[in-house]
From Swiss-Prot:
Keywords: Amino-acid biosynthesis, Cytoplasm, Histidine biosynthesis, Lyase. SUPFAM superfamilies: Ribosomal protein S5 domain 2-like (SSF54211). It comes from Rhizobium etli (strain ATCC 51251 / DSM 11541 / JCM 21823 / NBRC 15573 / CFN 42). Transmembrane segments: none annotated. PROSITE patterns: IGP_DEHYDRATASE_1 (PS00954), IGP_DEHYDRATASE_2 (PS00955). It is an enzyme of class 4 (lyase). It comes from the Bacteria. This is Imidazoleglycerol-phosphate dehydratase. It holds the Pfam family IGPD. Coiled coil: none annotated. CDD domains: IGPD. Its EC number is 4.2.1.19. It catalyses: D-erythro-1-(imidazol-4-yl)glycerol 3-phosphate = 3-(imidazol-4-yl)-2-oxopropyl phosphate + H2O. One of its GO terms (cellular component) is cytoplasm.
Length: 202
């Protein structure tokens, strides 16, 4: 088991004309994070993602924030997704599936994940305002689209109800975190097998 845990890490360095991003993850962590993207609300959400998934994350992003937050948020999602995919390897022994209905005050959001290697996002979340502070609410979807695409995750997000846009965004991140926490765990009954009748998830 110790050998498996030691191997479940992934690092990515991604540099474009718009952003420079480095990400390291440990799937068998305790939810420790060191995050700096230059976007305060986004840092707060990524801290929730790490803390509630128990995936250790180190994220440093420098982007063209003088234009807007879009490239930084999307490219960070790409890099986190790629790092998680590396950490999962051939995905042997993982639980694979998980879902949760997560409550926060007046808000309830459902996340369901399948670490299938087949990226797909179903997004049923609506915000009542274009911004949370200075953060564009449309970027929440952009982040999860990038994450799912690059981690090889089928991800469904459904906001059942909620009035506070901060709470809606935060429950999306926390629900995905809790689902990832379960889905990435090693199932001892799998005995190192790939959890698919096809014999592969990549």
């Amino acid at each position: 088991m110790a050998e498996t845990a030691a191997s479940r890490t992934g690092s990515v360095a991604r540099k474009t004309n718009e952003t420079s991003i480095s990400v390291s993850v440990n799937l068998d962590g305790t939810g420790k994070s060191k995050i700096s993207t230059g976007v305060g609300f986004f840092d707060h959400m990524l801290d929730q993602l790490s803390r509630h998934s128990l995936i250790d994350m180190e994220i440093e992003a420098k982007g063209d924030l003088h234009i807007d937050d879009h490239h930084t948020v999307e490219d960070t999602g790409i890099a986190i997704g790629q790092a998680i995919s590396k950490a999962l390897g051939d995905r042997r022994g993982i639980t694979r599936y998980a879902s949760i209905d997560l409550a926060m005050d007046e808000t309830m959001t459902k996340a369901a994940v399948d670490l299938s290697g087949r990226p797909f996002l179903v997004w049923n979340v609506a915000f009542s305002a274009p911004k949370i502070g200075t953060f564009d609410t449309e970027l929440v979807r952009e982040f999860f689209q990038a994450l799912a695409q690059n981690a090889g995750i089928t991800l469904h997000l459904l906001n059942h109800y909620g009035a506070n846009n901060h709470h809606i965004a935060e429950t999306c991140f926390k629900a995905v975190a809790r689902a990832l926490r379960t889905a990435t765990e090693i199932d001892p009954r799998q005995a190192g097998r790939v959890p698919s009748t096809k014999g592969t998830l990549v």
